[in-house]
Design a protein with these regions (language model features):
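N-terminal pre-Walker A segment at the start of P-loop NTPase domains
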Residues: 1-19
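Conserved lysine of the Walker
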Residues: 38
């Protein structure tokens, strides 16, 4: 926690003390440029939830999409999504990092729709919502995905310089 700013520390502590958001299938979105600590904050939140006996699973966005896409090719998409329902919280790291094919974004959208109001997500993205049309192939899908994600969400926009860059300048 010491590595984060006072506001980020307050967020982590608040989320720890008020984890009711998990029981109501709320989401946490961490949005900001590369290197500002989004994944570290997501990991801290996930660790705190695990300490509270909440089932959490971590995916890079690419790994999740590839897993779901393979399940769809095998005609097992619903089974794969249902298997993930045993986790109260799923972390999707770097949702905006990789441009996905139409087929991959379709399964990502289906997954978001499946989790809506039934399970919590912690999502990190280096793309603000105004650029999520680069993630999803059409405007209607983009709007629908964002709408479902933010409905019961805490949205944290993180600004600042890259911690990795700061560290490299010190060395």
């Amino acid at each position: 926690l010491e590595e984060f700013s006072a506001s980020e520390q307050q967020l982590i502590i608040a989320q720890k003390d008020h984890s009711d958001w998990v029981h109501y299938a709320g989401n946490v979105l961490l949005i900001g440029p590369s290197g500002v600590g989004k994944s570290h904050i997501a990991a801290a939140l996930a660790s705190q939830l695990i300490e509270q006996n909440v089932r959490v699973k971590w995916f890079s966005a690419l790994a999740l999409v590839q897993t779901l896409q393979q399940a769809k090719r095998d005609l097992d998409l619903m089974i794969a999504m249902t298997r993930l329902d045993k986790y109260q919280v799923l972390v999707i790291d770097d949702i905006g990092y990789v441009k996905k094919s139409d087929a991959e974004t379709q399964v990502l959208f289906e997954f978001i729709a499946h989790r809506y109001e039934s399970g919590s997500l912690i999502i990190t993205s280096n793309q603000p919502f105004s650029h999520w049309d680069q993630i999803f192939p059409d405007t209607m899908m983009t709007v629908a995905a964002i709408d479902r994600i933010i409905h019961h969400a805490t949205i944290i926009e993180i600004e600042g310089d890259s911690y990795r860059r700061k560290q490299s300048l010190k060395n």
